Regions:
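His/Asp/Glu-rich metal-coordinating catalytic cores
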Residues: 2-81, 86-298, 316-329, 348-352
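Hard-cation-handling environments
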Residues: 210-526, 533-534, 538
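A glycine- and charged-residue-rich anion-binding loop/surface
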Residues: 27, 51-55, 59, 76-77, ...
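Broad gene-expression machinery/nucleic-acid interaction feature
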Residues: 141, 156-158, 302, 473-477, ...
Length: 561
């Protein structure tokens, strides 16, 4: 099993007739999935998603793949193929189309509908190509065949990419639910047929590679959801991803069965469910869905609300309800159902929301106390099954953290794949498929690109570190007026502190330290204001840590008298 070396350099030119594969996101993390395929001088991109920030990234809205390595080759991109409509696969497309707006975007009907609604908010009219399972389309030197796969969102697709270098099969996100709500199963016959033709490189979903057995069917959630609808004494508030059409269908069915009306809450939820309903993916009995205004006329035990916020997002509807910052007020007897998984890194935010809801008297039903969620990803048994029918010559696990990628690679080896042909890559690692063998040949830039409000890429790791320091340690501004002739303090320095323990006398002990620092600088001939500010910042920082065990952000200002 090959792993990326930390000292990887830039990759050499791609040999003629070969194919280059570079993941710019989705490896070593759950999110911002984006894979670039290069062949015959052209580029094909599969997915372009976002990653949601952790608590250590304050102020960040989303994290994008790094487009640096393809920015000077935008005209070589023949298409962006989208496997399905989740944010971690389509959320980055608006930012890529800002770089070149006429890139063809390829996807299924629901995927493109979700994307077009998103792009409308960005003022972008995309050039789209609608495909469905069984279709085969050419994009430059890439011959793409689309295969139905089952996932937690309708219309998901795998893609087989044929070139002169060989065939690559990318599963996208998938599982093998044999009793899916929409009766659309993963097309294992197509996988087997492609395997017989010869799959030279298999890129497959690693999310649940550590989980033994097979992923539970979505239908097994029906009893728990129905029980909530049947036994809840007052309102039922269901929180889910705004794109989880299957789960929301189950909620609608259960609400209808028990005589409840349903209202959607949250802009993305209202938008996406409207799209799914219009396209026929969400079946809504007449009169079931009403506006929140109409709910005011109904008794509480006849009300169900479906909202966003299952991951504790601070601006989502459920979080605002928990904080009493929403028109819908949670009260005693309400039941809140968190009908989604807990994404790693969001635990603290979710538990804060649960505690807030509980504080106001709600009963919270979640994965920890009821069977209200199943994964949308294949477990180890399903992955082994796929390896055995696809029989790939080379394997590159995708979509997962390091432990998931490694576990998936181990499964491939157990099914007979040569360990030397299992490539464990990470974001930015270059994998070349040449003469039927996949190998790591180099690396390209693949850092985090932060979206902060309207600004893309302005926030850096250094600025995020400053934000964390501000939050944890506070900030101290020191203004020192210095005699231009002597270099000594002309008067006592001014201090302005925020988030740092202090009173009127807090900074008196540091004044002699500042005086000594400036005197030493004068003796050594240091007169440049920037250098003096650095010395001043260091002196105050050392004093703050020595006396208060704190590391505030120090902002020094030197003014010549």
């Amino acid at each position: 099993m090959s792993h990326p070396h930390p000292e990887l350099k830039a990759a050499p030119p791609l040999p003629e007739g070969g194919m280059r594969v570079i993941a710019l996101g989705g490896l070593g993390e759950i999110g911002r999935n984006m894979t670039v395929f290069e062949h015959a001088g052209k580029l094909l991109i599969v997915d372009c998603g976002v990653l949601f920030p952790e608590e250590t990234q304050p102020g960040v809205d989303v994290i994008l793949p790094d487009f640096t390595s393809i920015r000077d080759r935008l005209n070589d991109i023949v298409a962006v193929v989208l496997t399905h409509g989740h944010e971690d696969h389509i959320g980055g497309v608006p930012y890529l189309l800002r770089e070149r707006s006429d890139i063809p975007v390829v996807g299924s009907k629901l995927t493109l509908a979700f994307l077009e609604a998103k792009l409308k908010e960005h003022g972008i009219r995309p050039r789209t190509v609608r495909v469905r399972e069984g279709d085969r389309r050419g994009f430059g030197p890439f011959d793409c065949e689309f295969v139905a796969v089952n996932h937690s969102i309708p219309d998901s697709l795998a893609v087989a990419i044929r070139t002169r270098a060989g065939m690559v099969l990318h599963t996208g996100d998938f599982k093998m639910d044999q009793f899916p709500l929409d009766d659309r199963i993963t097309d294992l016959r197509a996988f087997a047929r492609l395997g017989e033709e010869g799959v030279d490189l298999f890129l497959t979903d690693s999310t649940n590679a550590e989980v033994p057995g097979f992923t539970t069917s979505e239908r097994e959630l029906n009893p728990a959801i129905e029980q909530v609808m049947r036994t809840a004494p007052r309102r039922v508030i269901v929180s889910s991803f705004a794109s989880h059409v299957h789960r929301i269908q189950q909620v609608l069915d259960a609400a209808h069965q028990h005589g409840r009306k349903v209202a959607f809450v949250g802009r993305s939820m209202v938008r996406n469910m409207g799209i799914a309903r219009d396209l026929g993916y969400l079946k809504v009995p007449s009169g079931l869905v009403v506006s929140t205004k109409e709910l005011e006329k109904l008794p509480d035990h006849k009300i169900t609300l479906v909202c966003t916020g299952s991951q504790g997002e601070p601006m989502a509807a459920l979080s605002r309800m928990a904080n009493r910052d929403h028109m819908i007020r949670i009260g005693k007897g309400d039941t809140v159902l968190l009908a989604s998984s807990l994404i790693p890194g969001n635990e603290n935010a979710i538990y804060r929301v649960i505690n807030g809801l509980t504080r106001w008297g709600a009963h919270v039903v979640h994965k920890g106390n009821a069977k209200v969620h199943v994964s949308g990803h294949a477990s180890a048994g399903e992955l082994v099954y796929c390896y055995n029918i696809v029989k790939p010559r080379n394997v590159m696990p995708v979509h997962g953290e390091w432990r998931h990628l490694r576990a998936n690679g181990d499964l491939a080896i157990r099914t007979g794949v040569d360990p030397d042909r299992v490539v464990i890559a990470e974001d930015g690692v270059v994998v070349d498929l040449v003469d039927g063998r996949a190998s790591i040949t180099g690396k390209v830039p693949a850092g985090n690109v932060y979206v902060d409000g309207m600004e893309v890429g302005g926030a850096t790791e250094a600025s995020l570190k400053d934000r964390l320091t501000l939050a944890a340690e506070g900030v101290v501004t020191v203004v020192a007026i210095v005699d231009a002739d002597t270099g000594a303090l002309a008067e006592a320095p001014d201090f302005l502190a925020r988030g740092f323990v202090h009173d009127d006398t807090t900074f008196e002990p540091v004044i002699p330290v500042i005086e000594k620092t400036l005197a030493t600088a004068a003796e050594e001939g240091v007169g440049d204001a920037r250098q003096l500010e650095q010395l001043l910042a260091r002196a105050v920082a050392n004093w703050a840590f020595r006396t208060h065990r704190r590391k505030p952000l120090i902002i020094p200002v030197i003014i010549d008298a």
